[in-house]
Amino acid sequence: KGLVAWMKANPGKATFVNQNAAGQTAGVMLQQLTGTSVLFVPYKGAGPAIQDMLAGHVDLLVVQAAAALPQVRAGTLKASANMSPARSPVVPGIPTSDEAGVPGLHLTGWFGLWAPKGTPKEAIAKLNAAMVAALADPGLRQKFSDLGLDVASRDQQTPEGLAAFLKAEIDKWWPIIKAAGIKA
């Protein structure tokens, strides 16, 4: 909340690091939701961006939790918000963006398991069953948690669930990406 107030009082002065189109999209959405403006600073990756954040050269940074988790856990980097709609079980002490004063700023990284078009439905079902079984393994879930990754809800662990999630993400982000002229 204090950061947004500072951004409003100092338009265009906050440096916002983005190392990919998703980060820039989050910055555009942040501006839209808060009525602020930022100076986008492109980086070639999360590592250099985090280093410059730690050194105080930039003001705002959006990265996957896995990239910043070691610094957050060590106390050298402050995580202002988790951009998921709900608190992450991996980092429950980090507030959501809604709780931090920017309702609706939701951007989550995710992974999907894909097969070539035309793959038989039986093969897809077998692959999906193996993936669901693997994701139920407590050891694998712990490894994901150690990396800062949440496992998708069971309803998203199906081809239909992934398709619905993907459609919702496209419907949400495409207008923002198009309006801002963001390129990959």
Predicted regions and their residues:
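Extracytoplasmic/periplasmic, Sec-exported soluble proteins
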Residues: 18-22, 45, 60, 64, ...
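Short, structured secondary-structure boundary patches
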Residues: 60-64, 83, 104, 127, ...
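Ligand-binding pocket segment of bilobal, Venus flytrap-like solute-binding proteins
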Residues: 13-94
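Hinge/capping helix and adjacent helix->loop/strand transition within the periplasmic-binding protein
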Residues: 1-48, 97-99, 110-143
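Residue-level detector of anion-binding/catalytic polar loops
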Residues: 37-39, 59, 103, 150, ...
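An extracytoplasmic/periplasmic, membrane-proximal ligand-sensing/linker region
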Residues: 73, 99, 121-184
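Acidic, amphipathic alpha-helical patches
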Residues: 68, 102, 162
